[in-house]
């Protein structure tokens, strides 16, 4: 291979966030990688590109010009374009004087409908383009325009940061379009790879794409040269410094092909998070994001302090739990607030433990930092009334709790480490403290009975005054989870790959010997969807969490009692 780093030359690195995910805040991964590379390698010129936001910008412009014709509800194409434009305008500017929930729900539902239809269409077009089928000329131009800013920059290495599975096909298309125009190296990384049990399979197995017309296999290696399935900072830095093929063996977390074989380098973690500077969002146009306020993502720890949930694979992402020091957190938060003029933060930590949450909240108060923030936490009794009031005083406005089920037996089988009675009290106390609660609920965990399903429904009814947003879903069997590795412990008698399973998105069907089967659970779930969508201020807040934070901040009131 042609080595990346020419002695004496400055390497140009593009870090790209591909479509498509919610366009409500800038991507954290590219911002952190950009900051780390700028600090640690003066010989690397780094630029981050949010092609996801550009994708939405271009889509909305093309829709308004009639280049893309979409029909929502019973509207014609012109009316649809007008209504979607009105929705975006409202979501960005229409809540500044008053956050009218009824109007918000109306407009955000229009925007969600647009997202669902447009993204499904473009995903199909991306697959067609990849496997060589014809696509409308307007679509071809749209895709090529997306990568033009990256090509104009002229990088030697392109890093694609994938957070969600919805980005995977687009990431491969971006890589293909870039390599068509210029012979450059492409590395794929991000949290999506981190939760994969066997990311090296992306090189070993063909990528199968199916459209309405045909199914075709592609070789991943013709578009992507390297994978970084673990932490990317040190790996990307070393990759940029590689001067020959031999140097690749010294790049931690790297997966690549050599002599027609897949090579996997040992994993590496940065134990001292103080070595990683705060995220750099300077390459992103923050005013373009679609929401009432600019909300910046922030990470104060890596890994999960619990790490025992039987359904989860997030323990693959960061390997072990580490925390950024409180003083360093404050320094980075101050910088974000002062440099970007932003007062809204979304903590992306897997969850913040009670003791750390107390220390962080008290430190924010002591330093007089005025922010509004959302964070993930576990509903345990340590979150008592005094602590929840402290969190509210520090600027906490939304806490996202992993409740999952109201059945204690199911929670024990999940190894959640929570008690449902304690969780219920935490939600009530948080509401009285002035906080808004977003809770996560998972239906259909293996062995869950109809009575336990209904137990969770009753819990939601009983506590609806303290549940301000609900993020609901059906159980998905994830490769690498304890359930998948030890199915006998969960009454699973058979696991097989689903027909629609792909190397980049493993999907499993399964059978159980007791409790609700997947089909029975789905029937129950759909039967109760209307009730579930009545929980909280708007059923859309579960998807648009940055909007929930803005709404919560607009309704600030002193804690009760």
Language-model features: locations:
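N-terminal [4Fe-4S]-dependent radical SAM core
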Residues: 4-11, 257-297
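Glycine-rich beta-alpha loop elements in corrinoid/cobalamin-binding modules
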Residues: 9-12, 20-58, 115-266
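Conserved Radical SAM active-site core
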Residues: 11, 54-62, 66-155, 180, ...
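Conserved SAM/AdoMet-binding glycine-rich loop
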Residues: 13-20, 157, 187-188, 195, ...
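C-terminal accessory regions of radical SAM enzymes
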Residues: 14-16, 23-24, 32, 49, ...
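Conserved, mostly hydrophobic/aromatic
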Residues: 37, 254, 304, 347, ...
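Structural recognition of alpha->loop->beta junctions
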Residues: 201-236, 390-399, 455-477
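Canonical Radical SAM [4Fe-4S] cluster-binding loop centered on the CxxxCxxC motif
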Residues: 291-327
């Amino acid at each position: 291979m042609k080595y990346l780093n020419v002695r004496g030359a400055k390497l140009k690195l593009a870090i790209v966030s591909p479509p498509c995910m919610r366009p409500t805040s800038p991507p954290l991964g590219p911002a952190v990688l950009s900051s780390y590379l700028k600090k640690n390698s003066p010989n690397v010129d780094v630029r981050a590109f949010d092609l996801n936001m550009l994708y939405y910008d271009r889509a909305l412009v093309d829709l308004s010009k009639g280049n893309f014709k979409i029909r929502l509800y019973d509207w014609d194409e012109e009316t649809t374009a007008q209504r979607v434009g009105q929705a975006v305008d409202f979501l960005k500017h229409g809540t500044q004087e008053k956050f009218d929930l009824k109007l918000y729900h109306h407009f955000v539902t229009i925007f969600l409908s647009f997202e669902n239809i447009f993204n499904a269409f473009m995903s199909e077009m991306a697959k067609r383009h990849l496997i060589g089928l014809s696509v409308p000329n307007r679509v071809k131009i749209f895709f090529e325009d997306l990568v033009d800013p990256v090509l104009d920059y002229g990088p030697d290495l392109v890093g694609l940061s994938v957070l969600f599975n919805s980005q995977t096909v687009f990431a491969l298309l971006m890589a293909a379009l870039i390599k068509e125009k210029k012979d450059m190296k492409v590395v794929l990384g991000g949290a999506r790879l981190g939760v994969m049990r066997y990311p090296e399979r992306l090189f070993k197995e063909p990528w199968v794409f199916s459209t309405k017309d045909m199914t075709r296999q592609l070789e991943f290696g013709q578009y992507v040269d390297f994978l970084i399935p673990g932490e990317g900072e040190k790996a990307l830095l070393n990759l940029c410094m590689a001067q020959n093929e031999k140097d690749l063996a010294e790049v931690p977390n790297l997966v690549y092909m050599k002599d027609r074989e897949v090579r996997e380098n040992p994993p590496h973690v940065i134990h001292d998070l103080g070595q990683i500077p705060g995220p750099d969002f300077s390459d992103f146009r923050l005013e373009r994001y679609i929401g009432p306020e600019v909300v910046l993502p922030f990470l104060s720890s890596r890994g999960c302090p619990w790490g025992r949930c039987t359904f989860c694979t997030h323990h693959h992402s960061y390997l072990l739990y580490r925390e950024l020091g409180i003083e360093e957190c404050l320094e980075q938060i101050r910088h974000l607030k002062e440099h970007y003029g932003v007062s809204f933060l979304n903590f992306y930590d897997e969850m913040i433990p009670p003791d750390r949450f107390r220390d962080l909240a008290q430190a924010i108060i002591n330093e007089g930092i005025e922010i509004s923030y959302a964070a993930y936490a576990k509903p345990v009794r340590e979150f008592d009334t005094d602590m929840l009031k402290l969190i509210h005083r520090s600027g906490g406005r939304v806490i996202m709790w992993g409740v999952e089920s109201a059945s204690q037996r199911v929670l024990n089988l999940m190894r959640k480490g929570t008690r449902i009675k304690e969780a219920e009290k935490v939600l009530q106390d948080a509401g009285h403290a002035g906080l808004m609660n977003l809770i996560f609920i998972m239906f259909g965990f293996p062995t869950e009975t109809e009575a336990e399903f209904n137990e969770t429904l009753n819990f939601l009814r009983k506590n609806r005054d303290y549940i301000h947003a609900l993020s609901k879903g059906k159980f998905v069997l994830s490769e690498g989870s304890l359930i998948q590795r030890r199915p006998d412990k969960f009454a699973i008698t058979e696991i097989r790959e689903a027909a629609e399973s792909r190397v980049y998105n493993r999907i499993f069907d399964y059978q159980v010997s007791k409790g609700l089967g997947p089909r029975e659970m789905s029937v129950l779930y759909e039967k109760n969807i209307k009730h579930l969508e009545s929980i909280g201020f708007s059923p859309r807040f579960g998807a648009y969490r940055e909007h929930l934070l803005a709404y919560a901040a607009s309704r600030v009131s002193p804690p009760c009692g």
